[in-house]
Amino acid sequence: MSETAPAETATPAPVEKSPAKKKATKKAAGAGAAKRKATGPPVSELITKAVAASKERNGLSLAALKKALAAGGYDVEKNNSRIKLGLKSLVSKGTLVQTKGTGASGSFKLNKKAASGEAKPKAKKAGAAKAKKPAGATPKKAKKAAGAKKAVKKTPKKAKKPAAAGVKKVAKSPKKAKAAAKPKKATKSPAKPKAVKPKAAKPKAAKPKAAKPKAAKAKKAAAKKK
């Protein structure tokens, strides 16, 4: 009898990560670290706020500055070098004035001139932004005014119709005036009786003529008596 050897099970080879995936994971890790760093405000802003909040006449010392930053939740021990660099950069820019010591180991005070100069441009920008908003709002008012003008233009059409009706009524009124003028013909009729009166007076003038025969008869009677 021939013996059959058991078949060897093939073990899967370990899958190597592609270099593209490694780069992607590194980028993601770097982005996460950058986000963590960017979440908090920069050191320069924290330093300026701490110095501005101090009421010391001679300025805020480095030790007092570190205490103020630590009270605000900033890790002073890890970021000691950053604090020193931030102080030097702010002094070079003119934001802070060094009243004592040299370098980062001294007392620092806020430069009022620089602070006022920074505040003025911000105020100008805010004023310009406010001025732009009304400029954008004016066209709406102009549109409303234009709509009102259109409404005013439409109204005269309605006003014209009553005017035309008034003209028609005025045109009809002369007919009534003509009807009122007809009674003038009736006034002419009294003139006819005036012409008739002289005709009636003629018989009165004829009566004396009738008296003449009486006189003749009287003369004849007188002659007979003789």
Swiss-Prot record:
GO terms for biological process: chromatin organization; chromosome condensation; establishment of protein localization to chromatin; muscle organ development; negative regulation of DNA recombination; negative regulation of transcription by RNA polymerase II; nucleosome assembly; protein stabilization. SMART domains: H15 (SM00526). The keyword Acetylation applies. SUPFAM superfamilies: Winged helix' DNA-binding domain (SSF46785). Histone H1 protein binds to linker DNA between nucleosomes forming the macromolecular structure known as the chromatin fiber. Histones H1 are necessary for the condensation of nucleosome chains into higher-order structured fibers. Also acts as a regulator of individual gene transcription through chromatin remodeling, nucleosome spacing and DNA methylation. Keywords: Acetylation, Chromosome, Citrullination, DNA-binding, Hydroxylation, Methylation, Nucleus, Phosphoprotein. Belongs to the histone H1/H5 family. It is found in: Nucleus; Chromosome. H1 histones are progressively phosphorylated during the cell cycle, becoming maximally phosphorylated during late G2 phase and M phase, and being dephosphorylated sharply thereafter. Phosphorylated at Thr-11 by GSK3B during mitosis in prometaphase and dephosphorylated in telophase. Citrullination at Arg-57 (H1R54ci) by PADI4 takes place within the DNA-binding site of H1 and results in its displacement from chromatin and global chromatin decondensation, thereby promoting pluripotency and stem cell maintenance. Residues 1-16 have a biased composition (Low complexity). Disulfide bonds: none annotated. Pfam families: Linker_histone. This is Histone H1.5. InterPro entries: H1/H5, Histone_H1/H5_H15, WH-like_DNA-bd_sf, WH_DNA-bd_sf. The modification N6-acetyllysine is found at K17, K49, K78, K168. The C-terminal domain is required for high-affinity binding to chromatin. Gene3D superfamilies: Winged helix-like DNA-binding domain superfamily/Winged helix DNA-binding domain. GO terms for molecular function: chromatin DNA binding; double-stranded DNA binding; histone deacetylase binding; nucleosomal DNA binding; RNA binding; structural constituent of chromatin. The modification N6-succinyllysine is found at K37. Residues 39-112 form the H15 domain. The modification N6-methyllysine is found at K27. Ubiquitous. Expressed in the majority of the cell lines tested and in testis. The modification N-acetylserine is found at S2. The modification Citrulline is found at R57. Residues 122-133, 140-161, 169-187, 194-226 have a biased composition (Basic residues). The modification Phosphoserine is found at S2, S18, S173, S189.
